[in-house]
């Protein structure tokens, strides 16, 4: 359902917005240009965020990362458990819809956690998202109802650290 309906809707939204944007530009319809640029950003953000998220999940996932990523997490957060607590707090503390993210800051050469709001892919400049969890209600409501904390706790059992 999540992949075949929600993610597919974002892809369709990208295609529709691109077509409408081309038409609006050809007609010099500035209001439609701005509207469709906004719609394109939203749907493209939804597509990009979900594409990263699918790679972050595996039925064989869980446990902890190893190697360079494990060392970077320990360096940035003090331990994997402290990182997991901070990332989970970002996810559970998100007001409304969005994503919790572990990103690599290419400017500061460090890992950090942050929240993304909605789907606008408003990732700070220089940040490469490494791990994301979808905190839109459609991601957890069917199975976890309104108990976001249970969803976030279960997320750690399917994190694909190999990717």
From Swiss-Prot:
It comes from the Bacteria. The keyword Zinc does not apply. Its cofactor is Mn(2+). GO terms for molecular function: metal ion binding; superoxide dismutase activity. Mn(2+) binds at residues 2, 50, 134, 138. Binds 1 Mn(2+) ion per subunit. Pfam families: Sod_Fe_C, Sod_Fe_N. Gene3D superfamilies: Fe,Mn superoxide dismutase (SOD) domain (1.10.287.990), Iron/manganese superoxide dismutase, C-terminal domain (3.55.40.20). Its EC number is 1.15.1.1. Keywords: Manganese, Metal-binding, Oxidoreductase. Belongs to the iron/manganese superoxide dismutase family. Destroys superoxide anion radicals which are normally produced within the cells and which are toxic to biological systems. This is Superoxide dismutase [Mn]. It comes from Mycobacterium scrofulaceum. The gene is sodA.
């Amino acid at each position: 359902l999540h992949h075949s309906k929600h993610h597919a809707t974002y892809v369709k939204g990208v295609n529709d917005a691109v077509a409408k944007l081309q038409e609006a530009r050809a007609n010099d319809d500035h209001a439609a240009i701005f509207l469709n640029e906004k719609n394109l950003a939203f749907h493209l953000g939804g597509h990009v965020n979900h594409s990263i998220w699918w790679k972050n999940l595996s039925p064989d996932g869980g446990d902890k990362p190893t190697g360079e990523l494990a060392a970077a997490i320990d360096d940035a957060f003090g331990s994997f458990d402290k990182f997991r607590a901070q990332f989970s707090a970002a996810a559970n503390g998100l007001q409304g819809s969005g994503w919790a993210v572990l990103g690599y800051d290419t400017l500061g050469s460090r890992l950090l956690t942050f929240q993304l709001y909605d789907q606008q892919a408003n990732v700070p400049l220089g940040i490469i998202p490494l791990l994301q969890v979808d905190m839109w209600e459609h991601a957890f409501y069917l199975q976890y109802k309104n108990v976001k904390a249970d969803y976030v706790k279960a997320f750690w059992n399917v994190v694909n650290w190999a990717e």
